[in-house]
C-alpha cells in the first residue's frame, strides 16, 4: 500500500477556515492520507489574477497552518513564472514522492470542467483525484464525464493506496458555504467583524496590518 499525499491547489486569496476544515476532515475520513500540501497558484489558468500578491498569500497560508503538522505549504507554483497548470506541477512533484500516491483534491464544480484543463488526458497518469462535494452543486450529465468515470472511478478508498495513480474517488464532507469572493467583498468595505468568524485570527491580523483587499 502506498501512503497518500494530498495536493490542495487554489489561489487561497485569502485562505479561510473552510479550506482548513476541508483538509482536516479529509485527513480524518481517509486514514492513509497523513499529509496535505497547500499549493497556491501564481496565475490560475481559468481565473483572474489573485488580488493579494504571491508573497502575501504564502504568508497567510503559513500563519493559517502553523502548529498543524499534517498541513504543509508547498510554493512550487509560486516559484514558477508562467500559468500554474496542474500537469506541470505534477510532473515536478512525482519524482520527489516516488513512494507515495499523489492525490489531487478538487471540488465537484472544478471537476465538471476537468476536460478543459491543460493536458487533462494525462493528469491521471500522475495522480488520483479526490473530488469533494460543493454545497448546492450537482455534476452535470455529460458523455465525456460518464466515460471518464466508467474508466477511473472507485468507491473504495483503499484503492487510492493500492495504486499510485489513475483513480477518481468522491468524498462527501460537511457543507461549508464559505466563499473567498464574499470575504474579499467585505474586506474591501472594511467589514472586519463580518469576516472574523470565517478567517483564522492570524490571517485577519495580517490582512489588517498590510491593508490587503481594501478598495
Curated annotation (Swiss-Prot):
InterPro entries to which the protein is assigned, alphabetical? Cyt_trans-like, NadD/NMNAT, Rossmann-like_a/b/a_fold
Q: Name one GO biological process term.
A: NAD biosynthetic process
Provide the catalytic activity annotation: nicotinate beta-D-ribonucleotide + ATP + H(+) = deamido-NAD(+) + diphosphate
Give one Pfam family: CTP_transf_like
Query: Which cysteines are disulphide-bonded?
Result: none
Q: Could you tell me which pathway this protein works in?
A: Cofactor biosynthesis; NAD(+) biosynthesis; deamido-NAD(+) from nicotinate D-ribonucleotide: step 1/1
Q: Which UniProt keywords apply?
A: ATP-binding, NAD, Nucleotide-binding, Nucleotidyltransferase, Pyridine nucleotide biosynthesis, Transferase
Q: Which GO terms describe its molecular function?
A: ATP binding; nicotinamide-nucleotide adenylyltransferase activity; nicotinate-nucleotide adenylyltransferase activity
Q: What is its EC number?
A: 2.7.7.18
Superkingdom classification of source = Bacteria
Answer yes or no on keyword Transferase: yes
EC main class here is transferase
SUPFAM superfamilies according to UniProt:
Nucleotidylyl transferase
Give the family, as the similarity comment puts it.
Belongs to the NadD family.
Role played:
Catalyzes the reversible adenylation of nicotinate mononucleotide (NaMN) to nicotinic acid adenine dinucleotide (NaAD).
Q: Which PANTHER family does the UniProt record give?
A: NICOTINATE-NUCLEOTIDE ADENYLYLTRANSFERASE-RELATED (PTHR39321), PHOSPHOPANTETHEINE ADENYLYLTRANSFERASE (PTHR39321:SF3)
By what name is this protein known?
Answer: Probable nicotinate-nucleotide adenylyltransferase
| Gene of this entry | nadD
Amino acid at each position: 500500500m502506498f501512503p497518500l499525499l494530498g495536493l490542495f491547489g487554489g489561489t487561497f486569496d485569502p485562505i479561510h477556515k473552510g479550506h482548513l476544515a476541508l483538509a482536516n476532515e479529509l485527513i480524518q475520513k481517509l486514514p492513509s492520507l497523513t499529509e496535505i500540501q497547500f499549493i497556491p497558484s501564481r496565475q490560475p489558468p481559468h481565473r483572474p489574477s489573485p488580488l493579494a500578491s504571491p508573497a502575501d498569500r504564502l504568508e497567510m497560508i503559513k500563519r493559517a497552518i502553523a502548529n498543524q503538522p499534517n498541513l504543509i505549504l508547498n510554493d512550487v507554483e509560486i516559484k514558477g513564472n508562467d500559468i500554474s497548470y496542474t500537469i506541470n506541477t505534477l510532473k515536478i512533484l512525482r519524482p520527489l514522492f516516488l513512494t507515495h500516491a499523489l492525490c489531487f483534491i478538487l471540488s465537484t464544480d472544478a471537476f465538471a470542467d476537468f476536460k478543459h484543463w491543460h493536458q487533462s488526458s494525462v493528469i491521471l497518469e500522475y495522480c488520483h483525484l479526490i473530488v469533494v462535494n460543493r454545497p448546492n452543486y450537482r455534476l452535470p450529465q455529460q458523455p465525456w464525464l460518464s466515460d471518464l468515470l466508467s474508466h477511473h472511478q472507485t468507491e473504495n478508498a483503499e484503492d487510492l493506496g493500492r495504486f499510485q495513480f489513475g483513480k477518481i474517488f468522491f468524498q462527501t464532507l460537511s457543507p461549508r458555504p464559505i466563499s473567498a469572493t464574499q470575504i474579499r467583498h467585505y474586506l474591501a468595505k472594511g467589514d472586519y467583524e463580518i469576516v472574523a468568524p470565517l478567517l483564522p485570527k492570524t490571517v485577519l491580523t495580517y490582512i489588517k496590518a498590510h491593508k490587503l483587499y481594501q478598495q
